[in-house]
């Protein structure tokens, strides 16, 4: 095998989308025992990649500085001392999985614990953008949000047309089937910033209701609209990607004993001035943040197992739809980043390696 591979890099270490380029002299990773070297076919594009490109979300320095949190591909080499005879994996297997980084490259090392066999029903393009998206949604709903049919009768996803929320809305609609199959499905709501995205959320994803945030520039009154379409009731679980300016209105929309899972700050991390935090007490509210990339291998492996057992079958049989908005050749990865930055997508953007 050649000594070098091609990988996406950033001129001067950080910069805008236009600074991305293909570095043809990137060393191929050395594969260790317990790992597989994967020849990458496709990778998903995520907000974390954009933050890393901007120098605001560093990679795991002792592993790789290459962007890319999810991939699909083919096993090229087994780790040292690993053989197909004593291993479930073999060279040529089609796989996909979650990464700490490194997916924007021709080859990537992956811990075997995080590998998932690609079903024949899924293309490399579909599989390449699955894990970061669906694992994040699963984590928010089940691991942190602690969904139960008894205590979670309503769920709200902010940024409802984002890839994670698209997955999360679908998971929420069917969450009772995992927890308590005889219980009614929860009511699922979302917010978005364009009317066509709200229509997509309701018509294509089947949400109970969606609110156009562009009609609520005060960043507060949307909460009243959500409660109105929820028959006057508050929301039990809110998953938020918008950030600081929405803390108070998230408290407004919560039901008693409601939870907020904070996964991002698209509108910035700073709260509005004079935020009223009384809702923390009066509603017994809980707010918890999370960042999937910083989680341990053991934690991520639990998500992997949950996905393989309870989500992947639904992606194969059609219960869940993995919405791929755009497939872009990787030498135009800058265009893929710009699509996300300009909020032009309803679903996932995936790059394919030629």
Label every PLM stretch briefly.
Residues 128-216:
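Mid-domain Rossmann-like dinucleotide-binding core that forms the NAD(H)/NADP(H) cofactor-binding site
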Residues 51, 69, 84, 94-160:
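NAD(P)H dinucleotide-binding glycine-rich loop of Rossmann-like/cofactor-binding domains
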Residues 3, 317-326, 334-354:
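C-terminal capping/lid region of NAD(P)-dependent oxidoreductase domains
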Residues 27-44, 56-102, 122:
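Glycine-rich beta-strand-centered segment in the early N-terminal region that forms part
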Residues 201, 245-319, 352-354:
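Glycine-rich phosphate-binding loop and adjacent beta-alpha segment
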Residues 218-232:
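Short amphipathic alpha-helix with an adjacent loop that forms part of the alpha/beta core around
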Residues 86-89, 149, 254:
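Short, well-ordered loop/turn sites that connect or cap secondary structure elements
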Residues 96, 236-239, 261:
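N-terminal Rossmann-like NAD(P) cofactor-binding module of classical short-chain dehydrogenase/reductase
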């Amino acid at each position: 095998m050649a000594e070098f591979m091609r990988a996406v890099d950033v001129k001067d270490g950080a910069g805008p989308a236009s600074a991305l380029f293909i570095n043809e002299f990137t060393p191929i990773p050395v594969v260790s025992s317990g790992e597989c070297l994967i020849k990458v076919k496709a990778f998903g594009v995520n907000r974390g990649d954009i933050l890393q490109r901007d120098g605001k979300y560093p990679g795991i320095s002792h592993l790789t500085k290459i962007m890319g949190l999810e991939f699909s591909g083919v096993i090229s080499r087994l780790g040292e001392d690993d053989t197909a005879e004593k291993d479930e994996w073999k060279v040529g297997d089609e796989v996909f999985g979650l990464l700490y980084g490194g997916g924007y490259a021709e080859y990537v090392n992956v811990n075997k614990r995080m590998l998932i066999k690609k079903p024949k029903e899924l293309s490399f393009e579909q599989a390449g953008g699955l894990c970061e998206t669906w694992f994040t949604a699963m984590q928010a709903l089940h691991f942190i949000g602690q969904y139960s049919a008894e205590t979670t009768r309503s769920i709200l996803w902010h940024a409802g047309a984002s890839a994670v929320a698209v997955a999360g809305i679908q998971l929420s609609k069917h969450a009772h089937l995992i927890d308590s199959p005889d219980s009614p499905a929860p009511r699922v709501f979302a917010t978005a910033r364009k009317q066509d995205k709200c229509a997509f959320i309701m018509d294509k994803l089947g949400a109970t209701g969606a609110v156009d945030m562009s009609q609520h520039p005060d960043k507060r009154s949307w909460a009243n609209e959500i409660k109105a379409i929820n028959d006057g009731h508050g929301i039990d679980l809110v998953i938020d990607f918008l950030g600081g300016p929405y803390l108070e209105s998230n408290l407004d929309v919560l039901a008693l004993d409601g939870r907020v899972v904070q996964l991002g700050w698209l509108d910035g991390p700073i709260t509005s001035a004079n935020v009223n935090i009384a809702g923390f007490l009066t509603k017994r509210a809980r707010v918890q943040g999370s960042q999937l990339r910083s989680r341990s291998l053991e934690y991520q492996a639990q998500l992997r197992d949950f996905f393989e057992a309870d989500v992947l079958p639904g992606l194969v049989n059609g219960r869940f739809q993995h919405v791929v908005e755009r497939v872009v050749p990787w030498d135009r990865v800058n265009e893929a980043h710009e699509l996300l930055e300009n909020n032009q997508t309803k679903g996932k953007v995936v790059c394919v390696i030629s």
